[in-house]
């Protein structure tokens, strides 16, 4: 489907085709391509900076793979669970090519299953959460443009210069007049808030803020809590503008808004506790050990090095390589013979 998207206040008139590529009778949609691009950039950021968090990039691969797959699965489950009777078949429920995923489902799935994978692969949990939170902001900031191509995730009417109109927004608003959240009225033929754009900007600004702060973090998990607070505040506001919110049953309550507000409150409380506990204690980062088996065999003969959290990236790379080279060179072939004292007669 092709949409003619207008921004009357800006004098812009765009033609947007939802289909990126057609192979035989199978369409590949821009929505999926954009989501995948956001994920890829998030992964590249995580792998490049893993060493700064004391995380081995080889073990991170498994954690990211599991977390990514389960993020997609849980994002769809969350979305379908809010309106299970809207789907005619099991295939309709699992087909995400046309959209229909919920970001909070993705967040829950990624962090829960990522935590399980981290335990399995012996990746430090809170530093992992700090790292992938920044990746999430990249992925969300880029991925929201998939909503633009689909002409979804927009808001109520606006007279602001960047108000958006298309036949897609008009058709959707005409079809949902009786199911809009309580107190929401719209004119289908008038421009609407491009809330996908608001969230994209909010996430990318959040990434810039938290990424510039990560070398100053006071405790492990602080960046993760900052992400929950930052994203939750923005989502609570933006969700209030949207016309396609997932509602909780027949209550009229917006699911994402409640989750956002609740998560902000909990994260803010944990942030205060974490800062109090970290007062006067500089954060040191244990460097990532590649060969965990040899480390275990070495016992007291090998202790991982640490660096202060504010050390430059290049120093983390150099020190980590040197430490692992030292472990590789450690000779464990000699069997230590315990000296036994001969009892006195």
Locations of regions flagged by a protein language model:
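A feature for loop-to-transmembrane-helix boundaries and adjacent hydrophobic helices
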Residues: 1-345
